[in-house]
UniProtKB/Swiss-Prot annotation:
InterPro entries: Gemini_C4. One of its GO terms (biological process) is symbiont-mediated suppression of host innate immune response. Keywords: Host-virus interaction, Inhibition of host innate immune response by virus, Suppressor of RNA silencing, Viral immunoevasion. Pathogenicity determinant. May act as a suppressor of RNA-mediated gene silencing, also known as post-transcriptional gene silencing (PTGS), a mechanism of plant viral defense that limits the accumulation of viral RNAs. It holds the Pfam family Gemini_C4. Coiled coil: none annotated. Belongs to the geminiviridae protein AC4/C4 family. This is Protein AC4. It comes from Pepper huasteco yellow vein virus (PHYVV).
Length: 60
């Protein structure tokens, strides 16, 4: 659970400062961890996108 929360915070922060966060991530997290973060980011991005699309389709 704690790991998931940390990843979520990292994703939200990375959106604000991509350049600064990328450097921090490379130093703080090893390469394998970065791959996991990217995968989680894609999964999280896809879920909200699908929900928004469904809502938009339902409104009209």
């Amino acid at each position: 659970m704690k790991m998931g929360n940390l990843i979520c915070t990292c994703l939200f922060s990375s959106k604000e400062n991509t350049n600064a966060r990328t450097t921090d991530s490379l130093t703080s997290y090893p390469l394998p961890d970065q791959h996991i973060s990217i995968r989680t980011f894609r999964e999280l991005n896809q879920a909200p996108t699908s929900r928004r699309t469904s809502t938009k389709t339902a409104i009209p």
